[in-house]
A protein has these predicted regions:
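C-terminal motif of bacterial Sec signal peptides marking the signal peptidase cleavage site
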Residues: 14-17
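Short, glycine-/small- and polar/acidic-enriched structural segments
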Residues: 24-156, 161-165, 170-175, 179-186, ...
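Pocket-lining segment of extracytoplasmic ligand-binding domains
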Residues: 88-89, 168-260
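Secondary-structure end/capping motifs
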Residues: 223-305
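Hinge/cleft segment of the Venus flytrap/periplasmic-binding protein
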Residues: 296-298, 302-322
């Protein structure tokens, strides 16, 4: 009997040894393109890398930075698969035949506004009549957001002067070179208040709903790389929630990705907090409103930036947030 038991044990061990070693889940390497340069507002993606959130979904992400128009061409041609892009860039690109598509909106509120010193008494959009407004240039989200706000208030280009000042909004305003400046809500207003200035801020989002930044891929990925796209969307959602729940942790992680970010920079910490207020943290597909895309398309057509109307509903997919 003992001999039979011994033989049975030997057989079990032999069978166990013959089993193939458990395989590690396949890792897909992708590049996630972010615009401009490393910035605290990209904290969720730094968190997703450092905390292994992308890895959890079988994805190894490398970050790259560059000009939005150049990057969207790479994604549209399927030379690369993912980027963070503005909603207007998605629409403009699709109108030119690039098959890019938003799969997850990042912002619930359009992140642009108009800031002025309290002494200028610009408390509503109609107060901009006769004023000089500084902005980086006649392009991008600043320009589009301002024109949308002005048009909604019944103003035309003849009612104000737009002055291209580069990214010097804070200095241009406090030295009274201009009456108001177009800003990112989470950036320049924080700097101005930190320097002790009392300001008024007109939010574009309070006037009308426009689509902001999104996770963007291409139609080939949506149809042929469903699991990968779902993984990127799920990882982004989780990273946003983790960052919003612990901004101090996210800030500390961001220091590994942003050169010269100080250990304790109160302005940059506040920029992160203000950014979080603008994010879309919910995944309810009802949050993806076609109206936001249609409104943006109307603005682009009115400005002459788009030459033809497209089907706005085809610019985004909510299949990965359901």
């Amino acid at each position: 009997m003992k001999r039979l038991i011994f033989l049975a044990l030997i057989l079990c061990l032999a069978l166990t040894a013959c089993k193939p070693a458990s395989q590690e889940p396949a890792i897909t390497k992708v590049t996630l393109n972010l615009t401009y340069i490393p910035n605290i507002q990209f904290a969720p993606f730094y968190v997703a890398i450092e905390k292994g959130i992308f890895a959890k979904y079988g994805i190894e992400v490398s970050l790259a930075y560059g000009n939005e128009a150049d990057l969207v061409a790479l994604v549209g041609s399927d030379n690369q698969q993912f980027m963070i892009a503005s909603g207007e860039q998605v629409l403009l690109s699709r109108a030119q035949g690039l098959p890019v598509i938003s799969v997850r909106e990042w912002y619930k509120d359009y992140p642009v506004g108009v800031a002025s010193l309290k002494t200028s008494q610009i408390s509503q959009a109609t107060d901009l009549r006769g004023k000089v407004i500084g902005l980086p240039g006649l392009y991008g989200a600043n320009y589009i957001g301002f024109e949308a706000l002005a048009a909604h208030a019944g103003l035309t280009d003849a009612d104000y002067e737009l002055r291209s000042i580069g990214f010097t909004q804070v200095e241009a305003l406090v030295t009274e070179q201009v009456d108001a400046v177009v800003v990112y809500l989470a950036n320049e207003p924080v700097q101005l208040r930190a320097r002790g200035y009392e300001i008024d801020v007109l939010r574009v989002a309070d006037a009308l709903s426009l689509v902001g930044n999104c996770l963007v891929t291409n139609e080939k990925s949506v149809s042929d790389r469903i699991e990968l796209v779902q993984g990127m969307v799920s990882a982004m959602q989780e990273a946003l929630a983790v960052t919003a729940a612990d901004p101090d942790m996210a800030y500390e992680i961001s220091r590994k990705f942003i050169e010269n970010l100080a250990e304790d920079d109160p302005i940059q910490k506040q920029v992160l907090l203000e950014s979080i207020k603008l994010w879309q943290l919910e995944t309810d597909p009802a949050d993806v409103e076609v109206t936001r895309w249609e409104n943006m398309q109307t603005v682009l057509l009115d400005l002459g930036l788009m030459k033809k109307q497209i089907e706005a509903r085809e610019a985004f997919s909510d299949a990965f947030t359901k």
